[in-house]
């Protein structure tokens, strides 16, 4: 379209939309359309210029965007000459490929000339004479030409190989960029930006009404609506004028005598105003029922009070209960009995004998030191609070918030956040950092600019803290306050305070590298120095430099915060006290041989001899917690009713949310609660009522050997910093005691000062893939607080290159970009990506989901171990391998409509299966995101196995003569785990999911493979000599030496 035609068209459109048109406006709109990147951006600019946000405006923006010519970069003379030279060089290269044919043609000509006859001797003599004269010169020229041709052949062959590999790399880069563009477009389409201008409800209704009227051509309804709106405004204006006239009458004419006409007119105005006022009041007091608002005294919504009545009245009775005339009476009695047993089971217990128990293996403790409290004297002399029995639960929560140590420093903290972009916050666990700081920022107005994000190192902490904050704010979890963890997202468009694991924030960085939807980022529990927290430090540091409007808060519970301050460019440190009461520290007089048995004895001794107060026991892991719980219950049953009620509450990561919440429930009067927890209770969770802490001095720490690729989760001694954190848990609500099950000599001489950061003792493959996806290629110069071992980085890069996630230049490939979208180990992600080739992606994501939940699928009750083992063997019929057995388990559970009873019958943990289902649903959604079709090929087990081998080909092992296995790459002796279905079969070649070190080097989740698959799938990784079977070779006969 020519420029004149475009100007005429825009002018006509302006007449229709605005009713006027000018040349300057037309030229301005065309220039705006040329500079806009998309029609949506052009619509926003038009609305800012005064256009109405309607369908006509959108259509006008799209059409002018399509008609406006785009500027194309001009080609200067130098670039044109370079392009011509490149084309000429390419042409010359193509000529060199025909030299072999030229030589053959010369040979053919010589043969034909030799066969010809009838030529005269005179001609031959002349030819011979001329050729003799030029023979010397021609020989030299031919030799030079042949040398040039040979060199040109070699160069062209090398250049062709390099050109092909370079073209392949560029093609892969283009495909990866297209995939990233598609992912960004999907994210943009599904995500609503918080910074976009939002219309009010009234404006939305008006826009919908006008839009529908324009579509129908109903201009008359628009006029009617406009007249109605005008009359409402006119009525309000006239009433105000009448009111002003009545009020001004005595002031203006108070001293003057009015005529009868003026008096009648004044009375008439007053009567009219009174009638209008009376009618308005009657409209406000309409005789209709309105739902009462459930607000508390401070104006916040009390959701508990709001829904309490509806929840209590509802009862889902079965058909048998409805036919029972005494159903309501029985339900009431059951409810009363349940309340009585829950609340008053230990309060009114009769004390029959008040003997002091003496345990055979009682432990002797010595009081070594006292951990002093802050403001302890003020707390002791403070006046007792008034009785709060009549106050609402919401009001009690607000009082609890004011009782936290951080409340005193609220204004100082907000001023510090306002004055500094990066702030290091130091306060002990339980001071209210995690729950209160995001609420303070919300109250200060930071959520108007974007969300407030708070990272947690553990899933349990993110869920429990988000639930607590939602309760304090009087809202429902998932609305204003939400959480996001791996395979579970409890947020909505209304969410302004978002708690998440540090890994989830890393995944958000893939789609939003600048974190534009956030106004504040809080990195909580920074002192734990987890793997992803250390990665976040370097990333948010760069983001804060690029975004001056972003506030960055680093929260730590340790007093040694200078290292964080130095890393974040000498950021200021904000400290406030957390512990309010002193804690007595007791050490054992001699080392303990069995820390679990010593912990049980210490708990029972505290329960019998010490005053009331809850007990917190730190144990390394889930297995230890379950063992201690069972032994405690057994000993309590033996003591009977001679002791008080002891409530045992475990807490660990795999525990369901409803069971995790029990640790926060108040303890009944007269009873004692003992919490068995992992090191999650050191800093991430604050449990009220804890007065005694039992610290065995051990925790489970993951370590990784990059040379062998073996991970081990070993029970190791804690550090002094962790011991101090554990001790501080006892001084929250009253003076407490900490019983350390090790000697003072061990504490001062054997324990390290700080825990080794996780980044220096774990597998870095997933982290390297994430950093590559974020565009960070120079990993050795990445800003780590504590750099990881260079050997671990190199091994991770080698693994990603072998999997095809990186090319020879270390750049991310299209397959690698797809792998980065899955929140899984790179090998599992590669297995899913390759499944598209073998048309079995539906089965592979089921296997990946089952592998992600770990080995906690089957359970073996002590009294039914044989039945549990037989149930497990039923899924391994045919020696299909552990991966196919997992697929059978999931499909069988799916066929029973996800039955809980089926899980009980087959000794399978329902909680693990439900989690696997959630993981699979998310993986299925990610398949569509990375443009992989969901296909099923259940009958072809070889295709499924090949997909598994394609992801885990570095994890292969070969059977040895002694019954053990030896890994093919980086040879070492390993064994099949006893829980595997192939532990008694011993196939010759296997591929394994994980290599762990317990009592031996065990392979977990094993599947048989054919050795030729390794050459077919990974020819770049395996050679024929690696997969040749040495047992099938016939060795030569040799004579052995005689025994002397």
Swiss-Prot record:
Q: Where is the composition biased (Acidic residues)?
A: 157-167
Which reaction is recorded as catalysed by this protein?
ATP + H2O = ADP + phosphate + H(+)
Q: Which portions of the sequence form the region Disordered?
A: 99-134, 152-211
Domain (Helicase ATP-binding) ranges: 414-577
Leader sequence range is: none
Question: In Gene Ontology terms, what is a biological process of this protein?
Answer: mRNA processing
One of the entry's Gene Ontology molecular-function terms is: ATP hydrolysis activity
Its function, per the record, reads: May be involved in pre-mRNA splicing.
Q: What is this protein called?
A: Probable pre-mRNA-splicing factor ATP-dependent RNA helicase DEAH6
Species of origin: Arabidopsis thaliana
Q: The organism's lineage? A: Eukaryota, Viridiplantae, Streptophyta, Embryophyta, Tracheophyta
**Source gene?**
MEE29
